[in-house]
Protein backbone atom coordinates (compact mmCIF):
# COMPACT_ATOMS: atom_id res chain seq x y z
CA UNK A 1 0.00 0.00 0.00
CA UNK A 2 1.00 3.59 -0.55
CA UNK A 3 0.12 6.60 1.58
CA UNK A 4 -2.15 8.78 -0.54
CA UNK A 5 -3.10 11.57 1.85
CA UNK A 6 -1.56 12.84 5.04
CA UNK A 7 -3.03 12.40 8.49
CA UNK A 8 -6.13 14.47 9.12
CA UNK A 9 -7.27 15.51 12.63
CA UNK A 10 -10.78 16.58 13.55
CA UNK A 11 -12.07 17.86 16.89
CA UNK A 12 -15.85 17.48 16.96
CA UNK A 13 -16.95 19.60 19.92
CA UNK A 14 -19.91 17.50 21.03
CA UNK A 15 -18.27 14.13 20.60
CA UNK A 16 -17.42 11.90 23.50
CA UNK A 17 -17.29 8.14 23.98
CA UNK A 18 -16.93 6.03 27.11
CA UNK A 19 -14.63 3.61 25.40
CA UNK A 20 -11.94 3.55 22.76
CA UNK A 21 -13.20 2.69 19.26
CA UNK A 22 -11.21 1.94 16.14
CA UNK A 23 -12.71 1.36 12.68
CA UNK A 24 -11.17 0.27 9.38
CA UNK A 25 -13.31 0.95 6.31
CA UNK A 26 -12.62 -0.25 2.77
CA UNK A 27 -15.00 1.36 0.32
CA UNK A 28 -15.09 1.52 -3.49
CA UNK A 29 -15.76 4.62 -5.58
CA UNK A 30 -19.48 3.84 -5.75
CA UNK A 31 -19.76 3.46 -1.99
CA UNK A 32 -21.14 -0.09 -2.24
CA UNK A 33 -20.19 -2.55 0.51
CA UNK A 34 -20.44 -6.28 0.02
CA UNK A 35 -19.15 -7.74 3.29
CA UNK A 36 -19.32 -6.59 6.90
CA UNK A 37 -17.29 -8.12 9.71
CA UNK A 38 -17.78 -6.84 13.25
CA UNK A 39 -15.57 -7.65 16.25
CA UNK A 40 -16.48 -6.44 19.75
CA UNK A 41 -14.85 -6.45 23.16
CA UNK A 42 -15.11 -4.32 26.27
CA UNK A 43 -12.27 -2.03 25.27
CA UNK A 44 -12.33 -1.94 21.50
CA UNK A 45 -14.78 -2.22 18.64
CA UNK A 46 -13.44 -2.99 15.15
CA UNK A 47 -15.50 -2.62 11.99
CA UNK A 48 -14.08 -4.11 8.80
CA UNK A 49 -16.14 -3.39 5.70
CA UNK A 50 -14.85 -4.89 2.50
CA UNK A 51 -15.96 -3.96 -0.99
CA UNK A 52 -14.94 -4.46 -4.58
CA UNK A 53 -11.35 -3.56 -5.30
CA UNK A 54 -12.22 -0.54 -7.42
CA UNK A 55 -10.33 2.53 -6.26
CA UNK A 56 -10.00 1.08 -2.77
CA UNK A 57 -9.87 3.70 -0.04
CA UNK A 58 -8.98 2.87 3.56
CA UNK A 59 -10.08 5.07 6.41
CA UNK A 60 -9.03 4.65 10.04
CA UNK A 61 -11.23 6.39 12.56
CA UNK A 62 -10.21 6.72 16.21
CA UNK A 63 -12.50 8.27 18.80
CA UNK A 64 -10.69 8.97 22.05
CA UNK A 65 -12.91 9.35 25.11
CA UNK A 66 -12.90 12.67 26.91
CA UNK A 67 -15.41 14.42 29.19
CA UNK A 68 -16.03 17.34 26.86
CA UNK A 69 -14.74 16.42 23.43
CA UNK A 70 -13.26 13.70 21.32
CA UNK A 71 -10.48 13.53 18.76
CA UNK A 72 -11.18 11.89 15.41
CA UNK A 73 -8.13 10.81 13.44
CA UNK A 74 -8.42 9.83 9.78
CA UNK A 75 -5.79 7.99 7.78
CA UNK A 76 -6.54 7.88 4.06
CA UNK A 77 -4.75 5.40 1.78
CA UNK A 78 -5.11 4.59 -1.85
CA UNK A 79 -3.96 1.18 -2.98
CA UNK A 80 -2.93 1.58 -6.61
CA UNK A 81 -2.12 -2.09 -6.95
CA UNK A 82 -5.75 -3.01 -6.32
CA UNK A 83 -6.91 -0.35 -8.79
CA UNK A 84 -4.92 -2.02 -11.54
CA UNK A 85 -6.20 -5.41 -10.46
CA UNK A 86 -9.77 -4.14 -10.82
CA UNK A 87 -9.07 -2.74 -14.31
CA UNK A 88 -7.87 -6.14 -15.38
CA UNK A 89 -10.87 -7.75 -13.72
CA UNK A 90 -13.13 -5.47 -15.78
CA UNK A 91 -11.38 -6.71 -18.91
CA UNK A 92 -11.79 -10.35 -17.84
CA UNK A 93 -15.55 -9.78 -17.55
CA UNK A 94 -15.65 -9.64 -21.35
CA UNK A 95 -15.33 -13.42 -21.30
CA UNK A 96 -17.53 -14.24 -18.30
CA UNK A 97 -20.34 -11.71 -17.91
CA UNK A 98 -23.63 -12.39 -19.79
CA UNK A 99 -23.21 -11.04 -23.31
CA UNK A 100 -26.50 -9.16 -23.22
CA UNK A 101 -25.35 -7.17 -20.22
CA UNK A 102 -21.94 -6.65 -21.78
CA UNK A 103 -23.40 -5.35 -25.03
CA UNK A 104 -25.61 -2.96 -23.09
CA UNK A 105 -22.65 -1.89 -20.93
CA UNK A 106 -20.34 -1.22 -23.87
CA UNK A 107 -22.80 -0.21 -26.57
CA UNK A 108 -24.94 2.21 -24.59
CA UNK A 109 -22.12 4.70 -23.90
CA UNK A 110 -20.97 4.33 -27.51
CA UNK A 111 -24.53 4.87 -28.77
CA UNK A 112 -24.85 8.01 -26.67
CA UNK A 113 -21.46 9.16 -27.94
CA UNK A 114 -22.25 8.39 -31.58
CA UNK A 115 -25.68 9.99 -31.35
CA UNK A 116 -24.00 13.03 -29.88
CA UNK A 117 -21.45 12.89 -32.70
CA UNK A 118 -24.19 12.81 -35.34
CA UNK A 119 -25.91 15.74 -33.66
CA UNK A 120 -22.50 17.40 -33.58
CA UNK A 121 -22.30 17.27 -37.39
CA UNK A 122 -25.99 18.04 -37.74
CA UNK A 123 -25.71 21.15 -35.57
CA UNK A 124 -22.92 22.43 -37.82
CA UNK A 125 -25.10 21.96 -40.90
CA UNK A 126 -28.16 23.56 -39.27
CA UNK A 127 -26.25 26.64 -38.16
CA UNK A 128 -24.55 26.94 -41.55
CA UNK A 129 -27.81 26.50 -43.46
CA UNK A 130 -29.84 28.87 -41.32
CA UNK A 131 -27.03 31.35 -40.60
CA UNK A 132 -25.08 31.47 -43.88
CA UNK A 133 -27.46 30.25 -46.60
CA UNK A 134 -28.59 27.40 -48.85
CA UNK A 135 -25.51 27.59 -51.06
CA UNK A 136 -23.30 27.16 -48.00
CA UNK A 137 -25.03 23.81 -47.40
CA UNK A 138 -23.99 22.78 -50.91
CA UNK A 139 -20.45 23.98 -50.23
CA UNK A 140 -20.36 21.93 -47.04
CA UNK A 141 -21.57 18.86 -48.95
CA UNK A 142 -18.60 19.25 -51.31
CA UNK A 143 -16.29 18.69 -48.32
CA UNK A 144 -17.78 15.26 -47.53
CA UNK A 145 -15.13 13.41 -49.59
CA UNK A 146 -12.47 15.19 -47.51
CA UNK A 147 -14.12 13.91 -44.34
CA UNK A 148 -14.31 10.39 -45.75
CA UNK A 149 -10.68 10.48 -46.85
CA UNK A 150 -9.51 11.83 -43.50
CA UNK A 151 -11.65 9.20 -41.78
CA UNK A 152 -10.10 6.52 -43.96
CA UNK A 153 -6.57 7.47 -42.92
CA UNK A 154 -7.62 7.76 -39.29
CA UNK A 155 -9.55 4.49 -39.26
CA UNK A 156 -6.62 2.56 -40.71
CA UNK A 157 -4.77 3.29 -37.47
CA UNK A 158 -7.51 4.00 -34.92
CA UNK A 159 -9.80 1.09 -35.67
CA UNK A 160 -6.91 -1.22 -36.47
CA UNK A 161 -5.15 -0.43 -33.19
CA UNK A 162 -8.29 -0.65 -31.05
CA UNK A 163 -9.34 -3.97 -32.57
CA UNK A 164 -5.85 -5.44 -32.17
CA UNK A 165 -5.79 -4.10 -28.61
CA UNK A 166 -9.03 -5.92 -27.76
CA UNK A 167 -7.60 -9.19 -29.04
CA UNK A 168 -4.39 -8.72 -27.04
CA UNK A 169 -6.32 -7.94 -23.87
CA UNK A 170 -8.35 -11.09 -24.47
CA UNK A 171 -5.07 -13.00 -24.67
CA UNK A 172 -3.86 -11.14 -21.53
CA UNK A 173 -0.83 -9.84 -23.43
CA UNK A 174 -0.58 -6.51 -21.56
CA UNK A 175 2.96 -5.73 -22.69
CA UNK A 176 2.00 -5.72 -26.36
CA UNK A 177 -1.08 -3.66 -25.48
CA UNK A 178 1.14 -0.91 -24.07
CA UNK A 179 3.32 -0.95 -27.18
CA UNK A 180 0.18 -0.69 -29.30
CA UNK A 181 -0.91 2.46 -27.49
CA UNK A 182 2.40 4.23 -28.00
CA UNK A 183 2.76 3.21 -31.65
CA UNK A 184 -0.82 4.23 -32.44
CA UNK A 185 -0.31 7.74 -31.05
CA UNK A 186 2.89 8.27 -33.05
CA UNK A 187 1.26 7.02 -36.24
CA UNK A 188 -1.73 9.30 -35.66
CA UNK A 189 0.51 12.34 -35.33
CA UNK A 190 2.53 11.49 -38.45
CA UNK A 191 -0.48 10.79 -40.66
CA UNK A 192 -2.36 13.83 -39.34
CA UNK A 193 0.49 16.18 -40.24
CA UNK A 194 1.07 14.64 -43.67
CA UNK A 195 -2.61 14.55 -44.62
CA UNK A 196 -3.24 18.14 -43.56
CA UNK A 197 -0.13 19.51 -45.30
CA UNK A 198 -0.75 17.75 -48.63
CA UNK A 199 -4.43 18.69 -48.76
CA UNK A 200 -3.75 22.34 -47.91
CA UNK A 201 -1.13 22.52 -50.65
CA UNK A 202 -3.55 21.32 -53.36
CA UNK A 203 -6.83 22.43 -51.79
CA UNK A 204 -8.57 24.17 -54.72
CA UNK A 205 -7.79 21.50 -57.36
CA UNK A 206 -9.00 18.81 -54.96
CA UNK A 207 -12.25 20.66 -54.24
CA UNK A 208 -12.98 21.10 -57.95
CA UNK A 209 -12.30 17.40 -58.43
CA UNK A 210 -14.77 16.67 -55.63
CA UNK A 211 -17.52 18.50 -57.52
CA UNK A 212 -17.19 22.15 -56.48
CA UNK A 213 -18.41 24.91 -58.80
CA UNK A 214 -17.81 28.65 -58.83
CA UNK A 215 -20.88 29.02 -56.59
CA UNK A 216 -19.66 26.61 -53.90
CA UNK A 217 -15.84 26.68 -54.01
CA UNK A 218 -15.56 29.69 -51.69
CA UNK A 219 -17.62 28.10 -48.91
CA UNK A 220 -15.84 24.76 -49.22
CA UNK A 221 -12.39 26.40 -49.20
CA UNK A 222 -13.06 28.52 -46.12
CA UNK A 223 -14.34 25.52 -44.18
CA UNK A 224 -11.56 23.11 -45.11
CA UNK A 225 -8.66 25.52 -44.50
CA UNK A 226 -9.41 25.57 -40.77
CA UNK A 227 -10.36 21.89 -40.57
CA UNK A 228 -7.06 20.83 -42.18
CA UNK A 229 -4.95 23.06 -39.92
CA UNK A 230 -6.41 21.22 -36.92
CA UNK A 231 -6.25 17.82 -38.58
CA UNK A 232 -3.70 16.36 -36.12
CA UNK A 233 -5.99 17.07 -33.18
CA UNK A 234 -8.91 15.49 -35.04
CA UNK A 235 -6.94 12.33 -35.79
CA UNK A 236 -5.74 11.98 -32.20
CA UNK A 237 -9.18 12.71 -30.76
CA UNK A 238 -10.96 9.98 -32.73
CA UNK A 239 -8.07 7.52 -32.35
CA UNK A 240 -7.83 7.84 -28.56
CA UNK A 241 -11.60 7.53 -28.25
CA UNK A 242 -11.45 4.17 -30.03
CA UNK A 243 -8.60 3.06 -27.75
CA UNK A 244 -10.55 4.12 -24.65
CA UNK A 245 -13.40 1.82 -25.67
CA UNK A 246 -11.02 -1.05 -26.35
CA UNK A 247 -9.39 -0.51 -22.93
CA UNK A 248 -12.72 -1.11 -21.14
CA UNK A 249 -13.48 2.59 -20.73
CA UNK A 250 -16.56 3.15 -22.89
CA UNK A 251 -17.99 5.77 -20.53
CA UNK A 252 -14.90 7.96 -20.78
CA UNK A 253 -15.13 7.77 -24.58
CA UNK A 254 -18.78 8.76 -24.33
CA UNK A 255 -18.00 11.71 -22.06
CA UNK A 256 -15.36 12.96 -24.49
CA UNK A 257 -17.81 12.91 -27.39
CA UNK A 258 -20.61 14.56 -25.42
CA UNK A 259 -18.17 17.24 -24.32
CA UNK A 260 -17.25 18.08 -27.91
CA UNK A 261 -20.93 18.30 -28.87
CA UNK A 262 -21.75 20.67 -26.01
CA UNK A 263 -18.74 22.91 -26.67
CA UNK A 264 -19.34 22.94 -30.43
CA UNK A 265 -23.03 23.76 -29.98
CA UNK A 266 -22.11 26.69 -27.72
CA UNK A 267 -19.36 28.02 -29.99
CA UNK A 268 -21.17 27.65 -33.34
CA UNK A 269 -23.68 30.49 -32.91
CA UNK A 270 -21.05 32.68 -31.25
CA UNK A 271 -18.54 32.34 -34.08
CA UNK A 272 -21.09 32.32 -36.94
CA UNK A 273 -23.39 35.13 -35.80
CA UNK A 274 -21.77 37.12 -32.98
CA UNK A 275 -18.28 37.24 -34.54
CA UNK A 276 -19.75 37.11 -38.08
CA UNK A 277 -17.24 34.46 -39.18
CA UNK A 278 -19.70 32.54 -41.35
CA UNK A 279 -18.73 29.02 -42.34
CA UNK A 280 -15.21 29.59 -40.97
CA UNK A 281 -16.75 29.98 -37.53
CA UNK A 282 -18.36 26.55 -37.76
CA UNK A 283 -15.02 24.97 -38.66
CA UNK A 284 -13.19 26.78 -35.85
CA UNK A 285 -15.81 25.69 -33.31
CA UNK A 286 -15.35 22.08 -34.43
CA UNK A 287 -11.57 22.10 -34.04
CA UNK A 288 -11.55 23.89 -30.67
CA UNK A 289 -14.08 21.43 -29.24
CA UNK A 290 -11.96 18.47 -30.35
CA UNK A 291 -8.77 19.99 -28.94
CA UNK A 292 -10.33 20.47 -25.51
CA UNK A 293 -11.64 16.90 -25.47
CA UNK A 294 -8.22 15.65 -26.58
CA UNK A 295 -6.60 17.25 -23.52
CA UNK A 296 -8.88 15.21 -21.27
CA UNK A 297 -8.19 11.98 -23.20
CA UNK A 298 -4.45 12.52 -22.87
CA UNK A 299 -4.81 13.04 -19.12
CA UNK A 300 -6.48 9.62 -18.82
CA UNK A 301 -3.76 7.78 -20.72
CA UNK A 302 -1.06 9.72 -18.85
CA UNK A 303 -2.29 8.45 -15.48
CA UNK A 304 0.16 5.76 -14.23
CA UNK A 305 -2.59 4.25 -12.08
CA UNK A 306 -4.43 3.11 -15.21
CA UNK A 307 -3.85 -0.41 -16.45
CA UNK A 308 -3.12 0.94 -19.95
CA UNK A 309 -1.15 4.19 -19.98
CA UNK A 310 1.67 5.96 -21.77
CA UNK A 311 5.11 4.57 -20.96
CA UNK A 312 8.63 5.38 -22.03
CA UNK A 313 9.91 3.06 -24.70
CA UNK A 314 6.51 2.42 -26.31
CA UNK A 315 6.73 5.25 -28.86
CA UNK A 316 9.43 3.69 -31.00
CA UNK A 317 7.65 2.36 -34.07
CA UNK A 318 7.81 -1.40 -34.48
CA UNK A 319 7.27 -3.02 -37.85
CA UNK A 320 5.37 -6.03 -36.49
CA UNK A 321 2.87 -3.87 -34.58
CA UNK A 322 2.36 -1.47 -37.49
CA UNK A 323 1.80 -4.44 -39.80
CA UNK A 324 -0.89 -5.91 -37.55
CA UNK A 325 -2.59 -2.53 -37.06
CA UNK A 326 -2.74 -1.86 -40.79
CA UNK A 327 -3.79 -5.45 -41.60
CA UNK A 328 -6.92 -4.97 -39.50
CA UNK A 329 -7.34 -1.30 -40.35
CA UNK A 330 -7.33 -1.92 -44.09
CA UNK A 331 -11.04 -2.78 -43.98
CA UNK A 332 -12.29 0.47 -42.40
CA UNK A 333 -9.74 2.35 -44.51
CA UNK A 334 -11.18 0.79 -47.64
CA UNK A 335 -14.72 1.52 -46.47
CA UNK A 336 -14.02 5.21 -45.92
CA UNK A 337 -11.84 5.55 -49.01
CA UNK A 338 -14.57 3.98 -51.11
CA UNK A 339 -17.10 6.31 -49.51
CA UNK A 340 -14.89 9.17 -50.65
CA UNK A 341 -14.83 7.88 -54.23
CA UNK A 342 -18.57 7.25 -54.21
CA UNK A 343 -19.37 10.75 -52.93
CA UNK A 344 -17.21 12.20 -55.70
CA UNK A 345 -19.22 10.20 -58.25
CA UNK A 346 -22.49 11.28 -56.63
CA UNK A 347 -21.52 14.96 -56.43
CA UNK A 348 -20.36 14.99 -60.04
CA UNK A 349 -23.59 13.35 -61.24
CA UNK A 350 -25.75 15.64 -59.10
CA UNK A 351 -24.04 18.79 -60.38
CA UNK A 352 -24.48 17.56 -63.96
CA UNK A 353 -28.12 16.49 -63.73
CA UNK A 354 -29.48 18.56 -60.83
CA UNK A 355 -27.17 21.51 -60.16
CA UNK A 356 -25.78 22.87 -56.89
CA UNK A 357 -29.13 22.57 -55.10
CA UNK A 358 -29.16 18.82 -55.71
CA UNK A 359 -25.75 18.59 -54.04
CA UNK A 360 -27.12 20.49 -51.05
CA UNK A 361 -30.12 18.14 -50.92
CA UNK A 362 -27.77 15.16 -50.83
CA UNK A 363 -25.93 16.82 -47.95
CA UNK A 364 -29.18 17.17 -46.00
CA UNK A 365 -30.28 13.60 -46.78
CA UNK A 366 -26.88 12.38 -45.63
CA UNK A 367 -27.19 14.22 -42.33
CA UNK A 368 -30.61 12.68 -41.61
CA UNK A 369 -29.43 9.15 -42.42
CA UNK A 370 -26.21 9.83 -40.53
CA UNK A 371 -28.06 10.07 -37.20
CA UNK A 372 -29.30 6.49 -37.44
CA UNK A 373 -26.11 5.18 -39.01
CA UNK A 374 -24.10 6.59 -36.11
CA UNK A 375 -26.38 4.86 -33.60
CA UNK A 376 -25.60 1.59 -35.39
CA UNK A 377 -21.94 2.61 -35.27
CA UNK A 378 -22.34 2.84 -31.49
CA UNK A 379 -23.69 -0.71 -31.44
CA UNK A 380 -20.74 -1.77 -33.57
CA UNK A 381 -18.27 -0.11 -31.23
CA UNK A 382 -19.88 -1.85 -28.28
CA UNK A 383 -19.67 -5.15 -30.14
CA UNK A 384 -16.04 -4.76 -31.21
CA UNK A 385 -14.21 -5.30 -27.88
CA UNK A 386 -16.62 -8.07 -26.83
CA UNK A 387 -16.28 -9.94 -30.12
CA UNK A 388 -12.52 -9.42 -30.25
CA UNK A 389 -11.98 -10.63 -26.68
CA UNK A 390 -14.20 -13.73 -26.98
CA UNK A 391 -12.67 -14.64 -30.31
CA UNK A 392 -9.20 -14.33 -28.79
CA UNK A 393 -10.34 -16.44 -25.81
CA UNK A 394 -11.90 -19.06 -28.14
CA UNK A 395 -15.41 -18.58 -26.67
CA UNK A 396 -17.31 -19.16 -29.91
CA UNK A 397 -20.82 -19.66 -28.49
CA UNK A 398 -20.62 -16.31 -26.69
CA UNK A 399 -19.35 -14.74 -29.90
CA UNK A 400 -22.35 -15.96 -31.92
CA UNK A 401 -24.79 -14.83 -29.22
CA UNK A 402 -23.48 -11.27 -28.96
CA UNK A 403 -23.44 -10.84 -32.75
CA UNK A 404 -27.11 -11.87 -32.94
CA UNK A 405 -28.04 -9.35 -30.27
CA UNK A 406 -26.13 -6.61 -32.09
CA UNK A 407 -27.91 -7.46 -35.35
CA UNK A 408 -31.31 -7.22 -33.67
CA UNK A 409 -30.52 -3.88 -32.06
CA UNK A 410 -29.12 -2.45 -35.30
CA UNK A 411 -32.19 -3.54 -37.27
CA UNK A 412 -34.54 -1.81 -34.82
CA UNK A 413 -32.57 1.43 -35.24
CA UNK A 414 -32.52 1.46 -39.04
CA UNK A 415 -36.23 0.60 -39.25
CA UNK A 416 -36.90 3.66 -37.08
CA UNK A 417 -34.77 5.67 -39.51
CA UNK A 418 -36.74 4.35 -42.47
CA UNK A 419 -40.05 5.37 -40.87
CA UNK A 420 -38.69 8.86 -40.18
CA UNK A 421 -37.38 9.30 -43.72
CA UNK A 422 -40.56 8.12 -45.42
CA UNK A 423 -43.10 9.94 -43.23
CA UNK A 424 -41.34 13.15 -42.17
CA UNK A 425 -39.00 14.26 -44.99
CA UNK A 426 -40.34 17.83 -45.14
CA UNK A 427 -39.77 18.51 -41.46
CA UNK A 428 -36.30 16.96 -41.66
CA UNK A 429 -35.33 19.25 -44.54
CA UNK A 430 -36.88 22.32 -42.92
CA UNK A 431 -34.45 21.98 -40.00
CA UNK A 432 -31.59 22.92 -42.30
CA UNK A 433 -33.02 25.54 -44.62
CA UNK A 434 -35.99 27.74 -45.41
CA UNK A 435 -35.20 27.76 -49.14
CA UNK A 436 -38.17 26.02 -50.81
CA UNK A 437 -36.19 24.82 -53.83
CA UNK A 438 -33.65 23.10 -51.61
CA UNK A 439 -36.44 21.64 -49.46
CA UNK A 440 -38.15 20.11 -52.52
CA UNK A 441 -34.90 18.51 -53.70
CA UNK A 442 -34.23 17.25 -50.17
CA UNK A 443 -37.62 15.53 -49.79
CA UNK A 444 -36.94 13.39 -52.85
CA UNK A 445 -33.36 12.71 -51.77
CA UNK A 446 -34.34 11.61 -48.26
CA UNK A 447 -37.13 9.26 -49.36
CA UNK A 448 -35.21 7.52 -52.13
CA UNK A 449 -31.88 7.40 -50.27
CA UNK A 450 -33.53 5.63 -47.31
CA UNK A 451 -35.78 3.32 -49.33
CA UNK A 452 -33.95 0.10 -48.32
CA UNK A 453 -32.48 1.57 -45.15
CA UNK A 454 -33.72 -1.35 -42.95
CA UNK A 455 -31.14 -3.62 -44.60
CA UNK A 456 -27.98 -1.70 -43.78
CA UNK A 457 -27.96 -2.41 -40.02
CA UNK A 458 -27.33 -6.11 -40.62
CA UNK A 459 -24.67 -5.34 -43.20
CA UNK A 460 -22.82 -2.94 -40.90
CA UNK A 461 -22.81 -5.33 -37.92
CA UNK A 462 -21.55 -8.25 -39.99
CA UNK A 463 -18.75 -6.10 -41.41
CA UNK A 464 -17.79 -5.09 -37.86
CA UNK A 465 -17.90 -8.73 -36.73
CA UNK A 466 -15.35 -9.87 -39.30
CA UNK A 467 -13.21 -6.83 -38.58
CA UNK A 468 -13.30 -7.54 -34.82
CA UNK A 469 -12.09 -11.11 -35.17
CA UNK A 470 -9.24 -10.12 -37.47
CA UNK A 471 -10.81 -11.34 -40.75
CA UNK A 472 -9.68 -8.25 -42.61
CA UNK A 473 -10.14 -9.60 -46.13
CA UNK A 474 -13.76 -10.65 -45.60
CA UNK A 475 -14.59 -7.40 -43.83
CA UNK A 476 -12.99 -5.38 -46.62
CA UNK A 477 -14.89 -7.31 -49.29
CA UNK A 478 -18.23 -6.67 -47.59
CA UNK A 479 -17.38 -3.00 -47.14
CA UNK A 480 -16.44 -2.70 -50.79
CA UNK A 481 -19.57 -4.52 -51.96
CA UNK A 482 -21.93 -1.85 -50.64
CA UNK A 483 -19.87 1.26 -51.23
CA UNK A 484 -17.87 0.47 -54.34
CA UNK A 485 -18.43 -2.78 -56.21
CA UNK A 486 -22.14 -2.22 -56.82
CA UNK A 487 -22.78 1.49 -56.27
CA UNK A 488 -20.20 2.93 -58.66
CA UNK A 489 -21.34 0.85 -61.67
CA UNK A 490 -24.95 1.80 -60.89
CA UNK A 491 -23.95 5.48 -60.76
CA UNK A 492 -22.35 5.09 -64.18
CA UNK A 493 -25.28 3.20 -65.76
CA UNK A 494 -28.46 4.74 -64.29
CA UNK A 495 -28.00 8.57 -64.45
CA UNK A 496 -27.58 8.79 -68.25
CA UNK A 497 -30.89 6.92 -68.59
CA UNK A 498 -32.99 8.31 -65.73
CA UNK A 499 -31.13 11.62 -65.10
CA UNK A 500 -31.39 12.86 -61.49
CA UNK A 501 -33.74 10.00 -60.53
CA UNK A 502 -31.05 7.55 -61.61
CA UNK A 503 -28.56 9.09 -59.18
CA UNK A 504 -30.96 8.70 -56.26
CA UNK A 505 -32.05 5.18 -57.30
CA UNK A 506 -28.47 3.89 -57.39
CA UNK A 507 -28.17 4.24 -53.60
CA UNK A 508 -30.96 1.86 -52.45
CA UNK A 509 -30.24 -0.56 -55.30
CA UNK A 510 -26.68 -0.95 -54.04
CA UNK A 511 -27.93 -1.51 -50.47
CA UNK A 512 -30.17 -4.37 -51.61
CA UNK A 513 -27.49 -6.21 -53.58
CA UNK A 514 -24.90 -5.78 -50.81
CA UNK A 515 -27.33 -7.19 -48.24
CA UNK A 516 -27.67 -10.43 -50.20
CA UNK A 517 -23.90 -10.85 -50.44
CA UNK A 518 -23.45 -10.11 -46.73
CA UNK A 519 -26.17 -12.55 -45.65
CA UNK A 520 -24.69 -15.42 -47.66
CA UNK A 521 -21.19 -14.72 -46.28
CA UNK A 522 -22.35 -14.56 -42.67
CA UNK A 523 -24.47 -17.71 -42.82
CA UNK A 524 -21.52 -19.63 -44.21
CA UNK A 525 -19.22 -18.46 -41.43
CA UNK A 526 -21.83 -19.08 -38.69
CA UNK A 527 -21.97 -22.74 -39.66
CA UNK A 528 -18.21 -22.91 -39.20
CA UNK A 529 -18.44 -21.28 -35.76
CA UNK A 530 -21.19 -23.66 -34.62
CA UNK A 531 -19.03 -26.60 -35.61
CA UNK A 532 -16.09 -25.23 -33.60
CA UNK A 533 -18.34 -24.52 -30.59
CA UNK A 534 -19.65 -28.09 -30.56
CA UNK A 535 -16.12 -29.44 -30.65
Language model regions located:
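Intrinsic disorder
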Residues: 3, 10-15, 19-29, 59-64, ...
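Small-residue-rich hydrophobic transmembrane alpha-helices
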Residues: 137-197, 234-253, 361-425, 456-475
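Short alpha-helical transmembrane segments in multi-pass integral membrane proteins
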Residues: 70, 74-107, 165-232, 274-329, ...
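Short runs within selected transmembrane alpha-helices of multi-pass transporters and secretion channels
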Residues: 158, 227-245, 256-264, 282-295, ...
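N-terminal transmembrane alpha-helices
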Residues: 94-132, 145-160, 164, 189-196, ...
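Hydrophobic transmembrane alpha-helices of multi-pass small-molecule transporters
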Residues: 149-152, 264-269, 294-298, 370-374, ...
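Helix-terminus/linker motif at the lipid-water interface of multi-pass membrane proteins
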Residues: 119-138, 207-214, 270-277, 337-367, ...
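Transmembrane helical elements of multi-pass membrane transporters/channels
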Residues: 105-124, 226, 260, 289-293, ...
Amino acid sequence: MFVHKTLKMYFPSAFAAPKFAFGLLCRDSTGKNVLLLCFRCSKICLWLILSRLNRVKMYCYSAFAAPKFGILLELHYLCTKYKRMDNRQATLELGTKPVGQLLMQYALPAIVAMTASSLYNMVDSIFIGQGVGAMAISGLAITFPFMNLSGAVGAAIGVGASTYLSVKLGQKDYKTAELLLGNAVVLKIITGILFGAVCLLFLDPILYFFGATENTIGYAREYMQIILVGNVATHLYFGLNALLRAASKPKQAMYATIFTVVVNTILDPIFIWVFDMGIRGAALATILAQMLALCWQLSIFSNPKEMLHFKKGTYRLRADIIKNILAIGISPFSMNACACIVVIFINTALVRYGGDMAVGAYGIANRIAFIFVMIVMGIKQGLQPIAGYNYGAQLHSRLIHVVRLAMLAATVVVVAGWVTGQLLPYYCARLFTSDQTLINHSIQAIRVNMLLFPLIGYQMVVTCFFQSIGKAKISMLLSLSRQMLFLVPLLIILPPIFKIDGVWAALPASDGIAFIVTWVTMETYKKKLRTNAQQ
